[in-house]
Amino acid sequence: MTLQETSVLEPTLQGTTTLPGLLAQRVAEHPEAIAVAYRDDKLTFRELASRSAALADYLEHLGVSADDCVGLFVEPSIDLMVGAWGILNAGAAYLPLSPEYPEDRLRYMIENSETKIILAQQRLVSRLRELAPKDVTIVTLRESEAFVRPEGTEAPAARSARPDTLAYVIYTSGSTGKPKGVMIEHRSIVNQLGWLRETYAIDRSKVILQKTPMSFDAAQWEILSPANGATVVMGAPGVYADPEGLIETIVKHNVTTLQCVPTLLQGLIDTEKFPECVSLQQIFSGGEALSRLLAIQTTQEMPGRALINVYGPTETTINSSSFPVDPADLDEGPQSISIGSPVHGTTYHILDKETLKPVGVGEIGELYIGGIQLARGYLHRDDLTAERFLEIELEEGAEPVRLYKTGDLGQWNNDGTVQFAGRADNQVKLRGYRVELDEISLAIENHDWVRNAAVIVKNDGRTGFQNLIACIELSEKEAALMDQGNHGSHHASKKSKLQVKAQLSNPGLRDDAELAARPAFDLEGAEPTPEQRARVFARKTYRFYEGGAVTQADLLGLLGATVTAGYSRKAADLAPAELGQILRWFGQYISEERLLPKYGYASPGALYATQMYFELEGVGGLKPGYYYYQPVRHQLVLISEREATGKATAQIHFIGKKSGIEPVYKNNILEVLEIETGHMVGLFEQILPAYGLDIHDRAYEPAVKDLLDVADEDYYLGTFELVPHAGARDDQAEVYVQTHGGKVAGLPEGQYRYENGELTRFSDDIVLKKHVIAINQSVYQAASFGISVYSRAEEEWLKYITLGKKLQHLMMNGLNLGFMSSGYSSKTGNPLPASRRMDAVLGANGVDSAPMYFFVGGRISDEQIGHEGMREDSVHMRGPAELIRDDLVSFLPDYMIPNRVVVFDRLPLSANGKIDVKALAASDQVNAELVERPFVAPRTETEKEIAAVWEKALRRENASVQDDFFESGGNSLIAVGLVRELNARLGVSLPLQSVLESPTIEKLARRLEREVAQESSRFVRLHAETGKARPVICWPGLGGYPMNLRSLAGEIGLGRSFYGVQSYGINEGETPYETITEMAKKDIEALKEIQPAGPYTLWGYSFGARVAFETAYQLEQAGEKVDNLFLIAPGSPKVRAENGKVWGREASFANRGYTTILFSVFTGTISGPDLDRCLETVTDEASFAEFISELKGIDVDLARRIISVVGQTYEFEYSFHELAERTLQAPISIFKAVGDDYSFLENSSGYSAEPPTVIDLDADHYSLLREDIGELVKHIRYLLGE
């Protein structure tokens, strides 16, 4: 026998060669044995034969004969078994029509197969009638059972089926587009069942779980196993996708044999309940490549069970080869398990793709299969049959052999087995190389973190490049994620902004509404001291270690450090200022370089969900009571009063706000809150000695929650008390130090125990890179050492608090050593991998485990310590996807490295449980960065301004206004710089989170314009300063839209905030005021909200000069002082004489002068071809709004509201009498633009107590705020003495 065959050429079953004959034989052998079970229903072999014979009788009566297709439209049930065997007994072929299939596919299968009779369950009949052609007869088992054969007719005989008769037709998808029906004959499936019986004892001793959807070929040996005498347990609908439901079924029915795809097998293992299936003896894995890693996991999880890897296209009748896995051979070998040797009666041939000649051992070729299990062909598709079922002359002069062309690649192993090498049609030309996608998928699946993987190629619509995208599902056992097994997507992918948004919302604080009616006491020391600010910003999570080498002396100095006090006193002796100073350490610290506020202590996830409540009497001059410390406003808020006892006390009750942490963390919530409490207590222990004080644990009294008015769900964490300092105390912590690869001078790599001021070698085993949280692994590699702290506190409530205290102490060192936490234990059975690893190390050395905290560290530079930005957070922005890609570099050539790795919670599966690559390719996750959005150039001035900053920040050219910031490569660090630059350039005060909430140029522009348009913000801050200098208030020109004042606000450089005043009427639903007097009155009311008292600095541009003048007059009449009134270009630009001489100041579109001025409000010019086109085409407000919207990209409704404001105010003039009675005491300066008409003040007198300063500018009415703004700024700064 040649290597190309290696099989028994004759079928193993002799004599009876049809399925009905085999079943009849089993009925004769054990008629009362259970043939099929479904939930609590059972059928014996005799009952199955009887019911299927009755159905066959009815079908024969309806005209069914050999090779006819009869549809089977039933859900998993006993009806399915009776239906399949009844159709076979009638001599026909059954066509599985799974009700789970899409209706279009079902409709196609029915029509293409020319099926005329379909058996359906009663409840599915109405649905089937909508799918099937009208000439199709629908029958039910109820009808067949009621059928009585007419007298004089004979019942059908089982012998009506022959070995070459069709047994069933399976529709399978392929590269040809439409599904095609594969015709399987009795002799083929009989051979398959005979092989299963002889090779793997699928016989009366076995209980088979039928869980594969019946429309797939692999389901057929499950359904037809009664022919071998086995009992078949029908799984519930959808159980193939429910690992835990499968396990329950296996246990309930004592299933011995299970068939599943590797994806499902991984799911069963990950449940950790798979070992409960004690009855299970055999696991058949097929349908996808079985990775060596999964095989190892399976044999370790289910020792003693047979694991068989099977392979076979539908066209070769289910399984054409198999390979029993030997656990002893799994330590080495290829990444995927061999598909083994051909089944009985089947031959394998691996041929060169070009010559169709056999290849040698180790050479890759295309697999062809021959033998008795080959399908007859494709139903009604002779063309496809001829393409795939070929007559090939394997040797010169030899008789041609009928072979099926699989399209799969393989190679012979030295032992005569076959190694699957991917699909011939799954090779792509990428980056100049021919790449096998299955090879990449298998390589990724052998990564410890990866549960399942698939690789696809997608084109980038903009660049035209091909992107290789790896889609992965993380292993719940191996991937080190926070909230392992219960994690949200934000732990697997750093594209999620969930955690950042939570952090920005101050989730741990009490709501302001809760505190509004309670007495609040402002504490002294709201402005932190330089020492406080420096030490708080020095206390950060360090992810870079740039300070050089670490020595043994450094570690001993770190671990031996103590804080001493020069004196001791009681808390009652604290002055109010000292109490404020102490608590200021626990408040927020803000830096313009950071997206998030900073605290002096660490908090898991930076959520700061632990609250402090002070129970005070005789301290700080406060009345006895329970006070909440509000860290943003540096206040103590009285929650409830306390009856005076005459004894001074200062106790601190710690409360964990569940709602503040639960959106981000699901596991170990209590533990992380207790650790955070420890960090806070540790901070107290560091700062109190300077005041002669210390903090001691006092009691665990959960009843105190009732006095603090907190939510029932919130956690009481413990009570501490401020006491006189009495010297150093035992910290109840046991410390182990591990050194990394020669990075600590004097200490070789290993585990050391710190005791009595010395480090003693404890073990060679250390926490490894893979044992820390995935996103921290690159930091681990940079770290010089790691520290494990074990809590030996006696009281349960103090155990995790002790851990946080110790790390806080170590963080606040003066040795330039920085740390990052990397794992902790759990009270609730969810320890992180570092904890499990250290427990094993301790256990191997006879030391009991306890609550623990692990962190890595290294030396940091002075620059790092002093930095107030977010540089240390940059590493933390890399998630498991990026880290896995880094690891792929070590075992894949560079041209096979994916451009992206996309993490899925679960990869989509097809109905037969395989990874659905088409669904992956169409998924939102894959296409998030590839979506071919149309390029939309910036349209408005605001969009153009934002785009310029955007492109610079992201280092991208030609940004579309619809590009997503984060999908374009942005992150939190870049967001900080982007927002700061936007605020400076545009004179606005966008909050840092605005990029998170409005992540496109378009949305940012809308947000900016919307905020400008809000009535609550009619005084729009165009330039922000943090000092206390009085602001400049400036009114814009006609239309009242202040954005054209941004350049002036940004260029003036007075160290003062600059507000532009938006007219009432710009916002939707507002009606402009009817007089300047009313306008000024309402503006003063809004002004008082910003600046309650004078002196006021008022400026006005163009028409805004009139409003500024009236506002100054009304303020002075109210007794306020105006220190400067600047009237900038108070005259109107001169329009063409013919445009204004007839209509004067009438606001009418018939008045070409008015239309010209209105045009200039939006364009900043009163000439040019656009104006000419406007004057020619515009006839009313609606047409003008449409014209401007098209010209400038402004919203039509906003344009109409601005037009309305202009129309109302265009005619505003002071009468001679009104102006005569208005005399201002404020100094007035008039800046006249070249070419303007006279203003409302000229040719008048008496309006100013002092002669005004008049400055003639070279700039015109519009350029003075644009290209010539430098001239105006120079004159203003000179007048102000700048």
Curated annotation (Swiss-Prot):
Spans through the membrane: none
Pathway: Pigment biosynthesis
Gene that this sequence comes from: bpsA
Region feature Adenylation, mapped onto this chain: 24-379
Enzyme Commission designation: 4.3.3.9
Function comment: Nonribosomal peptide synthetase involved in the biosynthesis of the blue pigment indigoidine. Catalyzes the synthesis of the blue pigment using L-Gln as a substrate. Two glutamine molecules are cyclized and oxidized to form indigoidine.
Cofactors named for this entry: pantetheine 4'-phosphate
GO biological process: amino acid activation for nonribosomal peptide biosynthetic process; antibiotic biosynthetic process; secondary metabolite biosynthetic process
Sites bearing O-(pantetheine 4'-phosphoryl)serine, chain numbering: 972
Name of the protein this chain belongs to: Indigoidine synthase
